[in-house]
From Swiss-Prot:
Chain positions covered by the region annotation Disordered: 30-88
Entry annotated with the keyword Ribosomal protein: no
Name this protein carries in UniProt: Expansin-B7
UniProt domain Expansin-like EG45: residue ranges: 112-218
Any one GO CC term of the record: membrane
Disulfide links within the chain: C115-C143, C146-C213, C151-C157
Localization (cell): Secreted, Cell wall; Membrane
Record function comment: May cause loosening and extension of plant cell walls by disrupting non-covalent bonding between cellulose microfibrils and matrix glucans. No enzymatic activity has been found. May be required for rapid internodal elongation in deepwater rice during submergence.
BP term (GO), one: plant-type cell wall loosening
Pro residues: bias regions: 57-75
Organism, scientific name: Oryza sativa subsp. japonica (Rice)
Gene name of this polypeptide: EXPB7
Bilayer topology annotation: Peripheral membrane protein
Amino acid sequence: MAGRSRRRSFWSVGVAAALLCLLAAHGCSAKHHKPKPTPGGISGNASSSSSNSSTPSIPPPVAPTPTAPTPPIPSPGTGSSNGSSGGGGGGWLNARATWYGAPNGAGPDDNGGACGFKNVNLPPFSAMTSCGNEPLFKDGKGCGSCYQIRCVGHPACSGLPETVIITDMNYYPVSLYHFDLSGTAFGAMAKDNRNDELRHAGIIDIQFRRVPCQYPGLTVTFHVEQGSNPVYMAILVEYENGDGDVVQVDLMESRYSTGGVDGTPTGVWTPMRESWGSIWRLDTNHPLQGPFSLRITNESGKTLIADQVIPADWQPNTVYSSIVQFD
């Protein structure tokens, strides 16, 4: 019996070691992302992310059915998203964390991710990003959510909270809640000058809580995606204070007018469909007429209207900033 028990123990250790190697190799590689829908039903895969975190490429496992509830929507005043150590007590949940990509990078080689955000190495994301498993990523509805995280149980942990934004997905069966962090975000949880020591730990225990997102000086921004055309509009929504995520986007066209004068709004809202991540799309059987107004709804049910934020002469792969923001 003792020998049988010992064999079981060795087997368990082996499985844990194999899982650690698997995570180190992949993180939330772009290979795991949903294919990006494009006009005409053609789809393609994003490029692979960095493999700096250790072993050869191997296929990802099938995602398990999540059993953990999604974290609660943050209340105003519960923490902050600026990385400070203050902000409300309680509400901490247990999770595990890994990291991928370059040690001081933002995760993916292309500084993107399954949410569709771009240049997450730059402010306001500043590489403080994370992949989330299903209770965090929520099939894309969790994109843009902000979480305070703090590591526990390792000598290099500072114990101070840092704030990360969900920009990518990872469905590896590590724990009920799993943050696969950028190298920058993982190292930020360490004591001074012990960042590399903490990163070398691989998988660590952390605590987390959802907090309101704060983007000082920024308004809600809309990026018209490459491939958009008169009968297909795809829009990335960014920089929403509060919940940080979006559960519905609606578009209002303008009436056609002659003489080069912009038309007035039609007053009719057309629901857009979630394409992938934080990108919403509208396919039509008629040429869309701008300027376009957009109405976004967050997880708390609050709505925000950006009147005629996208002009009639809009262009693909262009950013249009609104003058509105969630309170």
